[in-house]
Amino acid sequence: MKLTPVSAAVLSVLAASQVHAKSDVFSMEEVVVTANRIEQPVSEVAGSIAVVTSEEIEQKGETELYDALRHEPGVSVSGGAGRPQNITIRGMTGNRIMIIRDGIRSADGFGANDNNDKVGRDTFDLSNLESLEVVKGASSSVLGSGAIGGAVILKSKQPGEFLEDRDFYVDATGTYTGISNKYKGASNLAFRSGDTESLVNAAYWQGEETRNFSQDLYNRDLDGYSASYAINHFFNDEVMIKARAELYRQDQQRLEGSSSIQKDGKWHIEDFAEDESTEEYSAYLGAELTPLDPTWFEELDTKVYWRHTEVITDTNRLMNSTDANGLLIKRRELEHKTFTDSTVGLRADFKQTLHASSAEHKLAYGVEIASDYYQREDNQKALDWTGSNASQKQPFASARAYNIGLYFRDMIELEKWTLTGGLRFDAHRLSPDGQNDIGGYPLKDIDSSEISPSLSISREVFENNRVYLSYDHGYRAPEYDKAYGFVSHDFVPLTPFVIAPNMDLEAETSDSFEIGNKFDNGRAQLYVSAFYNKFQNFIDVVTTGQDNFGNYVKQYQNLHGVETYGAELSAAYAFTSSWKLSTKLGYVDGKDAEGEYVRSITPFEGNVGLNYQQQDFNAFATWNWAGSMDRVPSCQTSLGQKTECAKTEAWNTLDLGAGYQITKDFRLSATIINLFDKEYIRYQDVAGIADESKRYSTEPGRYFTVNAKYIF
């Protein structure tokens, strides 16, 4: 329920007095999540959800999605600053993981084998996020198409979070991280005027590409900024009007690179320059209703929204070679690439509470209508002694997608039992935009629809201990680039190939099962879970034959039999109000129908942390580790030849950190990562690449972060 500013201020004072009165009792903070549309403490959710807060991100000096999620078993992020970042959850990766922010779906990424190594999923700034919730497993019964392997739910900061007991607030935060030599400044300005609250957030950063251990990667300089404005107007005790607008931009420059593959032999790079810009604009306008005398809903959250994401890459290569007469010849190659992903839509989410037959029903239901637009272009121009040769390619036909989703959830609480059922219907249409064919293949609309159910049951077997069993269905409509793509690689020596479109693709689906136990008495926590995921119509590339020009023809097709499974454990114990020990560990395995290991599974991994908190001072030590990884599929070289996939050795590192509240308004914290400067490779960073190509994929050596925050 939304409160007017006066009501919120009164309640905050009362809450503060209650906390002070109970200061002699200590317990770990209870985390409440909304990933299933119904607020629940994470200890009572029948499933696995990880939460990262803005306070944790600030104090550890984390500036990348990669940093924020690196301590969560079963969850990993490849890439880093200056490189596309891609999320993996329990063996599923790429666009099978949905990222949704304030109810608005984030842009897809792209890259070979779902690596998203060309465009990543990190088109947002961490400094204006309140929290990240990671749903481990299918969540299509709540979020619809795209959440087949899991979801990351981002919540932006709101004005009221800064204005509980004041009418004006401003802060400034400065961060340095040695992993990318990045300097970042950010500020929040919140103010209240009558019944209207506003929040302005701005950030600017400069740095370099995330380094490896030897610091021998091509160097990339980057700078960027983000800005947002949110406004909430309390029309009365029942209605709040809200709006938010945000922009994000990051520019990257690289003056080092390699030559591209040429059809007329080997060429050497002489000069190289690449500029890349990533821009995202988003906005929404909505209202929240909390009727004082509710009838068929207690809360309504509705909004219309828009998001536009664009990535532009310009590459300039000067190459040289020697002709048959021994003369030095040169060729300049210019390339301009664009990637566009936009969405516009509206949604309405309702909540209601009913009491019937001695049971409490917490209901959540809603509707979403959205339209997406996708476009990629590739313009090339080559200049050499033969003249100028320009070409315009569109490897993927521009497309529009239309989706409507309806969902309903009911959480029933009866004594010690909790039963939660959910159902969502999605209808989806993918249509080519302005093209009837690509590469000589005719294009057509692709329609799909799906009913995605979920069901969970949990019981409190004794005080503070709950066992649960859950089932969730996942669904993803065919992606435009896998259906409408015609990509020629006829320049590849030995094994030239083309990727052909496929108008017969069907939607991917998954069935996720999880069983677990959660104990949490405020002082001790123990969460244990085991999971199994079965995927049907899994879309992957296969070789179908050869064309009339001798090129191998590859195509994305629906496959069967992909499955992943594993187990996770999370435990914590507060010895005193100052000392806490915690540990997390996880294991993910999986194979396809041919018995090949799933590329994106992870080794046995985890961490152990010791935290100290005493009044204005806190400190922590975290030991991170992972076992060796030899459960790998077969791979291909850049020339298409079969080879051994990369394997990794076991590793462990130690991180240290401390923070001090110097005054009530000024806080300083610092972290040392990889204290003993160990060289190692995370399997997640080399999954699915040839073993011979992994030498540049080491993690950084020892580095430090510093964060300072001042509240004016």
Model segments located where?
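Acidic, small-polar-rich N-terminal luminal/periplasmic segments of exported/outer-membrane proteins
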Residues: V13, K22-F162, N181, S470, ...
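Outer-membrane beta-barrel translocator/receptor signature
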Residues: N113-D114, S127-S131, K136, S141-F213, ...
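Transmembrane beta-barrel wall of Gram-negative outer-membrane proteins
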Residues: Y176-Q206, Q215-L255, D275-T290, S357, ...
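Membrane-embedded beta-barrel scaffold of Gram-negative outer-membrane proteins
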Residues: E197-V200, E298-R317, R466-Y468, D472, ...
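Gram-negative outer-membrane beta-barrel transporters
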Residues: Q352, S357-S358, E413-L419, H428, ...
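C-terminal beta-signal and adjacent terminal beta-strands/loops
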Residues: Y475, K534-Q536, L581, G627-C635, ...
